[in-house]
Structures are given as structure tokens and as C-alpha cells.
């Protein structure tokens, strides 16, 4: 599927100077449909929207002039940690939880730096980062974890969302953000107009939503793909 949707590319910005209620309303208006498709609980919704925004920023901006691929896993922390292992000394270990919330602007810049390292980020339902640099165990004999044309990061995202209650958000080096829940690809977020003519969409029976005010296009799985 390609670039015949007439999407206008407008920079995606949710200003940090906004009043919190206004900012939350804008995030929900932009990504609420993704949360609904992922069957996200109310208590996890705000966290998921914040993480998706961070993922879109990474997809759009990259880091130090190059594209970045990474993975965020939200919720069911105990099971996620049990089904993953550290690839390196955890750069988030030992920091107080109040400085590790995804909504903190200074932390978001730190996370963007750490995203250049291998491994996944793990957050709890409240939006606190609990670990970074995690290698997610993937059952290589489960074909449902693999999508032709997508790599091991997306297999890990599908697998961990299938075997735990977590929702996973994968950022590809081609600048597309994909959201997985219950082992299924629930949405793709395309942050730039030119990508629509280059990227194949993998979301089953997608509903395409244009959000020109946010500068993104959403491909959200249809009900029959639930």
C-alpha cells in the first residue's frame, strides 16, 4: 500500500509548555484510536500514548544524523523481565522511580540517547522505566511471531505481547512505528509523507486515518483482525 492518501507532512509537536490537560487531550486525540485497537486498559492508556509519542519522535528525528530502531514494552513487568535478559549493564538501574517517568522531558532526551544501544526498554503501567537494554526471548519455531519483510525486533515485539500482558511498540530504522498487542500487529504510524510511497503496510485490513495537524498517518487494524 502506498502514497495515494494525500497526507500533508506537518511537524508533529506536542508542546511541553502546554497545560497538562491540554497536552493530554491532544495526545489522546492523536493516539487514542491506537490504544483502542490495542485493547488498552484505561490505566495504561496515558502511558501508552506518551510512549507512542516518544517512539514517533525517535522515528522522525533519529539520533546524531542516523535512523534509530528500538523497542518499548509497556506493562506486565514481572513477566516481561522473566522472558527477557540484560544485554549490558542496565543504564537505568539504581535511579529513583520519580525521575524515570516517560513524561519527564529531560528523561526523554536520555532515552533517545540510550535508544542507540541494543535491546528493549521496559516500562510499567504508570509510565516508569524499569529497565533498558533487554534482550527479549523469541520462540523461533512460532511462525506467527514473524512478518515477511520485518526483522527480529518486530518478532520480539509480537512474541512478548503474545506471551505476556504487555503492549509493545517497535521503531523501525525505516522510521515506521508499529504497535503490537496479544501477538497481533494492531497499528502502524507513519511519521512522514514520503514514507507512504516507500513502506509496505503490514497491518491487517487497515483503516487509514489522516492526522494532518499532527503530521502523522495511522493504519489501524480493522475489527475483523481482532
Predicted regions and their residues:
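Divalent-cation
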Residues: 11-226
